[in-house]
A protein has these predicted regions:
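A sensor for short, sequence-defined functional sites
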Residues: 1-169
Length: 169
């Protein structure tokens, strides 16, 4: 098993907190929670026992989606949704901004909407002033869109559709 160097900080309560600059670029965490429950041995002058990296609770990695949509009688869905995320969820969503060219941001976001429907049209997206600035705050984006034929009308006149969040978004 390859291991690399990390820094360890001793907190005021005596616990050790590992810091790993190689795993957390563009991540809001000081220690990547993708590296949970791993053993490590801090090199301190007084010596220490084998430690284990902490578990990060799910609420530290939330994804929240709030939608405001209107489905017309022709089956066209119009509206917006705001997505907010923190922790590893933030890192995964923010990757569009931190690893891609700025000229491709809109196309990358539109591809996410096209996962819902190939007929989707991204009318606009607000990702704030500096979505690359992962240290400022959790990621928050608002999409505005229209999806023609999102719902199909049955012979009885009932609109049938698959819930938006079940469409790989």
């Amino acid at each position: 098993h390859f291991n690399h160097c990390v820094a360890v900080v001793k907190l005021s309560d005596g616990t050790m907190m590992p810091l790993d600059p190689t795993w957390v670029p563009f991540c809001r965490e000081l220690w990547s929670s993708a590296e949970q429950q791993q053993n490590y041995l801090p090199g301190t002058p007084e010596g220490t026992d084998l430690c284990i990296t902490p578990i990060s609770a799910p609420e530290n990695h939330y994804v929240r989606i709030q939608a405001n949509n209107v489905l017309d009688d022709k089956g066209t869905l119009k509206g917006s949704f705001t997505i907010e995320a923190e922790g590893q969820s933030d890192s995964n969503i923010r990757r569009i901004f931190t690893t891609g060219f700025q000229s491709e941001w809109k196309n990358a976001l539109e591809r996410q909407l096209l996962n819902v429907s190939p007929k989707a049209r991204l009318e606009g997206v607000d990702y704030g002033r500096s979505p690359k600035d992962y240290q400022r705050a959790p990621i928050r984006m608002t999409f505005r869109y229209e999806i023609p034929d999102y719902a199909l009308k049955s012979d009885q006149g009932v609109l049938i559709f698959k819930p938006f969040v079940l469409n790989n978004l």
